[in-house]
Amino acid sequence: MATKGGREKIKLESTAGTGHFYTTSKNKKTMPEKMLIKKFDPKARKHVDYKEMKLK
């Protein structure tokens, strides 16, 4: 059985202020810095930056 614990669930929250977010996971060992990704925000109806936040 494979070992667990390498990946952590995160929330990508829109910087446009609409409150929209995506959830995903990332490997903390290979990518320790915070993610900043351009994705589509359906509430703003355009591509905006999404910042990594902690998933509660």
UniProtKB/Swiss-Prot annotation:
Keyword set includes Methyltransferase: no
The protein's name: Large ribosomal subunit protein bL33
Top-level lineage group: Bacteria
Recorded GO CC terms: cytosolic large ribosomal subunit
GO molecular function annotation: structural constituent of ribosome
Cross-referenced PANTHER family: 54S RIBOSOMAL PROTEIN L39, MITOCHONDRIAL, LARGE RIBOSOMAL SUBUNIT PROTEIN BL33M
Coiled coil region boundaries: none
Signal peptide segment: none
Originating species: Albidiferax ferrireducens (strain ATCC BAA-621 / DSM 15236 / T118)
UniProt record, GO biological process: translation
InterPro entries: Ribosomal_bL33, Ribosomal_bL33_sf, Ribosomal_zn-bd
HAMAP family: Ribosomal_bL33
UniProt keyword Ribonucleoprotein present: yes
Residue spans of biased composition, Polar residues class: 15-25
Stretches for region Disordered: 1-28
UniProt KW keywords: Ribonucleoprotein, Ribosomal protein
Extent of Basic and acidic residues compositional bias: 1-12
Family membership noted in the UniProt record: Belongs to the bacterial ribosomal protein bL33 family.
